[in-house]
Amino acid sequence: NSGNPCCDPVTCQPRRGEHCVSGKCCRNCKFLRAGTVCKRAVGDDMDDYCTGISSDCPRNPYKD
C-alpha cells in the first residue's frame, strides 16, 4: 500500500518510529490514546474504547 504514509512501501509494515498502518485506533501512524471512543454505543450497547497499545478497537468486556 504505497499510498499510505505510515506504511513502508517494500514491507507494508509500519515505518520506523510509527506504531500502526491502519485501524480504528490508529491516526497519523500512532495509536490513539487509551480511553478514546472507537465505536459509539447503539441502543442498549456500550461504547468501545481504544487501549492505547493497539490499532484494533476491542469489544467492551462489560457488554452482555
From Swiss-Prot:
Cystine crosslinks: C6-C29, C20-C26, C25-C50, C38-C57
Tissues of expression: Expressed by the venom gland.
Domain of life: Eukaryota
Gene Ontology molecular function: toxin activity
SMART domains found in the cross-reference section: DISIN (SM00050)
GO cellular component, one term: extracellular region
SUPFAM superfamilies linked: Blood coagulation inhibitor (disintegrin)
Motif Cell attachment site mapped to chain: 42-44
Chief site of localization: secreted
Keywords (A to Z) from UniProt: Cell adhesion impairing toxin, Disulfide bond, Hemostasis impairing toxin, Platelet aggregation inhibiting toxin, Secreted, Toxin
Locations listed in the record: Secreted
Miscellaneous information on this protein: Negative results: does not inhibit alpha-1/beta-1 (ITGA1/ITGB1), alpha-2/beta-1 (ITGA2/ITGB1) and alpha-6/beta-1 (ITGA6/ITGB1).
Subunit structure: Heterodimer with VLO5B; disulfide-linked.
Family under the similarity heading: Belongs to the venom metalloproteinase (M12B) family. P-II subfamily. P-IIe sub-subfamily.
Designated name of the protein: Disintegrin VLO5A
Organism whose genome encodes this protein: Macrovipera lebetina obtusa
